[in-house]
Amino acid sequence: FNWITDLYVKHFTKVPLVINYHRWMGAGKDWAGEENFDPDSKRLLDSACEKGFSLRHDAFGMREYYGQRERNYVKPWIMKRPVLLEGGWIVSKHPYHNDPSGYKTAKDVRIGEFEDGQEAHVNMMDFRVGDETMSWFRDAYPLVERFISEGGYRLYPDSIVVPKEMKSGSRIKIVHRWNNLGWGYCPTNIPQWNQKYKVAFALLNQDNQVVYSYLDNNTDLSVWIKGYPTSYEFTPKLHGVKKGTYT
């Protein structure tokens, strides 16, 4: 396990890596009853996450295969590593009526998957392909719309204070505050991204072209969590700015 995860980390330095948080990790089993699991799975999965792996599961909505053990495992990693959702039931083929949740329709299955994803604060929803994708749009389109507006990360500045007039060569103060309307987070903290995304400000000329730009290196998008606005004071120096009107 360490050999293969180390190999991926070594060679995929710019691409996010993802691992399934399965209860039988490396144990040669797929399932042995809801109450059973390999106690070593948590240690192995934690080691992968600490190396920079993100998390996914392919049984969301299945009350047996995505049970309390899976829910408990992912909790400490929420907002530390992004979580990806894939539903377990293929509604056109699987006997989803047997699920302990008592699903009666395909819409019920989609609701169960969505609610499990909301609980895990997932960043992405995998609609699969073919009939499964069609089911999401046919049977549960309002949930698709909800994920677009609520899921993952939805970042916006609700306050930006800048001076109206500035003097070239002077240092100005910009106060900006950011909110996340999504239940997920922007995973700039994963090693493959390594904080590569930051907030920047620019002066635009009358043709709406960027002529000067300033990067606020103190911003960390991964800590912007829903319900907790984050504020910054940025004091760039306007070196070499020509006299004029900018936006």
For each feature predicted by the language model, list its residue ranges.
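Catalytic-core regions of glycoside hydrolase
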Residues: 2-131
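Structural beta-strand segments of beta-rich domains
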Residues: 170-174
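Short, acidic/polar linear motifs in exposed loop/turn regions
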Residues: 180-184, 207, 238-242
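A beta-strand/beta-hairpin structural motif
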Residues: 211-242, 247
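Internal, hydrophobic beta-strand segments that form the core of beta-sheet-rich folds
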Residues: 197-203, 244-247
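Catalytic cores of secreted or luminal carbohydrate-active enzymes
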Residues: 110-163
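Short coil-to-beta strand junction motifs in C2/discoidin
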Residues: 187-200
